[in-house]
Amino acid sequence: STYFDWVHYTESQRQREDTILKALLREIWQNNYKAYGAPRLRLALSDLNLHHGTNQVRRLMREASIYSVMTRRFNKPTTTVDYRQRPNLIRHLPEANAWSMDITYLKLSNGQWVYLASVLDLQTRKILAHQISATMDTKLVVTTLQRSLSTDKKPNYLHTDMASQFTSFGFENLLKRHKIDHSYSKLGHPYDNAKIESFHSLLKCEMIYQFRFPSIAHLILDVSKYIHWFNNERISLANPKIKVA
């Protein structure tokens, strides 16, 4: 019947459109470290002037076996702090001109630990500098911060935890020379430095755990590529017009 033919045609047309959308979603997903779930993929389609609901995108993802990568945990080496608590100067200053800095552990294919130091602008949420080293020492954090200070307007505050690298004479002296006040997380409260911790978690979830790194050189290259993507292309759910997490 004419009605049957119309229904059959409509379904076939929808199937063809779904097939095209699935291919496009897969391309966007693969080009963004397989990091995007339905909300970010929907926004990516909107950037292409293709407007579809989150539920539809979620259905197409499920049918195409497209899944956002998931976080997994690992047990990292621990460090000790032998200093008294120092003040958190930015706790009640959410709009302060402040940077945050932290060190995280990354593992090569052979099981060797290496160390990534990163500096985050707390206002723009962008990574200003980073460095990877086989040793977790004062030189790592000093040279990483110097990179930030050489290319960006200096902050009023720098917030870190109380690891020995950040309380070392060399690091504290660098801050004093640049007239930057040092703010510290409370001992045993890593969430005081949540934004830089969140970035390192995203890095591991969205990139590190998907690949193997036979050498520190391979890791340095891939982390640099990821950070460029994070700063310039990653879709923000908080503000979709801003391409940063």
Predicted segments, located by residue:
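RNase H-like two-metal-ion nuclease catalytic core shared by retroviral integrases
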Residues: 77-81, 160-162, 168-172, 182-204, ...
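Hydrophobic beta-strand scaffold residues
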Residues: 68, 181-182
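Mobile genetic element proteins and their domesticated derivatives, centered on retroelements
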Residues: 3, 25, 41, 57, ...
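C-terminal domain-tail junction helix/linker
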Residues: 11, 23, 176-180, 202-245
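Active-site beta-loop-alpha junctions of metal-dependent nucleic acid enzymes
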Residues: 112, 130-152, 167
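Acidic/histidine-rich, metal-coordinating catalytic segments
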Residues: 145, 152-167, 240-243
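An active-site-proximal beta-strand-loop segment
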Residues: 95-128, 134-135
